[in-house]
Swiss-Prot record:
The U-box domain is required for the ubiquitin protein ligase activity. InterPro entries: CHIP_RING-Ubox (IPR045202), CHIP_TPR_N (IPR041312), TPR-like_helical_dom_sf (IPR011990), TPR_rpt (IPR019734), Ubox_domain (IPR003613), Znf_RING/FYVE/PHD (IPR013083). It comes from Gallus gallus. This is E3 ubiquitin-protein ligase CHIP. The keyword Kinase does not apply. Homodimer. GO terms for cellular component: cytoplasm; mitochondrion; nucleus; Z disc. Residues 12-29 have a biased composition (Gly residues). Pfam families: ANAPC3, CHIP_TPR_N, U-box.
Length: 314
């Protein structure tokens, strides 16, 4: 069985492999195409040895020989991804998509680049596109694309939550300053009135203490309110084990396969009808009548939904 890196380089489960030039390959002479293919195969060998800079250079030579083959760009993009050179990988993915808009690898690697560059909306869109194309083309990438999509969605959620936290902290600081400023203003006015009215010292202390207590309560109530918001936010996380392996969303009707993998029923049934009769993670043979409702998981999911009303917006 091929390892993940080899499947990525070749295109995974039936995608364009080392021996295929891919769409748009007819732009050069037979001699040039043959030479480009040799460079590509050299790049594959170097990539297999984890020599990513050398592999990228070999794919670059293939591109120089024949710049019309999308897979050369996606192979080099994967090298750049391994070297964390995301700008270069991004450019190669976009060029590959210009040559072949249906390239699963190009969308997959582009989504990974955008995720690393914290462009989460674009990353999710491209990873979802890669997943949909893989289903349409009946290519099996195992859990590679679904896993990347789950990570991108979680990172986007965390980014949104971080912004919310910063906004709440700024609001808390602003309101604290307002309350403190109002307290100082009232204290100053009270002291001035006490002097003008010649209020005795004991009565004056009581008046000032009342102002202090009032604003201290404002601060305490505000802190309690923000604390409640913070406590609710800490619970805004859907555990991975409650998410489907295909849709990456909270499961609604979990069912388990003979391999022990739990899926959302509508997603696994769609997979069996559109892609093939096998478990998408383990690749073991699977038919619809082998799906068994996971009642224990359903009970856990229902309890989670009832306790977390925000879950629909996750």
């Amino acid at each position: 069985m091929k390892g993940k890196e080899e499947r990525e380089r070749e295109g995974g489960g039936g995608a364009v492999g080392p021996g295929a030039a891919g769409p748009g390959a007819g732009g050069g002479s037979p001699e040039k195409s043959h030479s480009a293919q040799e460079h590509k195969e050299q790049g594959n060998r170097l990539f297999g040895g984890r020599k990513y800079p050398e592999a990228a250079a070999a794919y670059g030579r293939a591109i120089n020989r024949n710049p019309l083959v999308a897979v050369y760009y996606t192979n080099r993009a994967l090298c750049y991804l391994k070297m964390q050179q995301h700008d270069k990988a991004l450019a190669d993915c976009k060029r590959a998509l210009e040559l072949d808009g249906q390239s699963v690898k190009a969308h997959f690697f582009l989504g990974q680049c955008q995720m690393e560059m914290e462009n989460y909306d674009e990353a999710i869109a491209n990873l979802q596109r890669a997943y949909n194309l893989a289903k349409e083309q009946r290519l099996n990438f195992g859990d590679d694309i679904p896993s990347a999509l789950r990570i991108a969605k979680k990172k986007r959620w965390n980014s949104i939550e971080e912004k919310r936290i910063n906004q709440e902290n700024e609001l808390h600081s602003y309101l604290t300053r307002l309350i403190m400023a109002e307290k100082e203003r009232e204290l100053a006015e009270c002291r001035k009135a006490q002097q003008e009215e010649n209020v005795d010292e004991s009565r004056g202390r009581v008046q000032l203490a009342g102002i202090e207590a009032k604003h201290d309560k404002y601060l305490a109530d505000m802190d309690e309110l923000f604390s409640q918001v913070d406590e609710k936010r800490k619970k805004r996380d859907i555990p991975d084990y409650l998410c489907g392996k295909i849709s990456f969303e909270l499961m609604r009707e979990p069912c388990i396969t003979p391999s022990g993998i739990t899926y959302d029923r509508k997603d696994i049934e769609e997979h069996l009808q559109r892609v093939g009769h096998f478990d998408p993670v383990t690749r073991s043979p699977l038919t619809q009548d082998q799906l068994i409702p996971n009642l224990a998981m359903k009970e856990v999911i229902d309890a989670f939904i009832s306790e977390n009303g925000w879950v629909e917006d996750y």
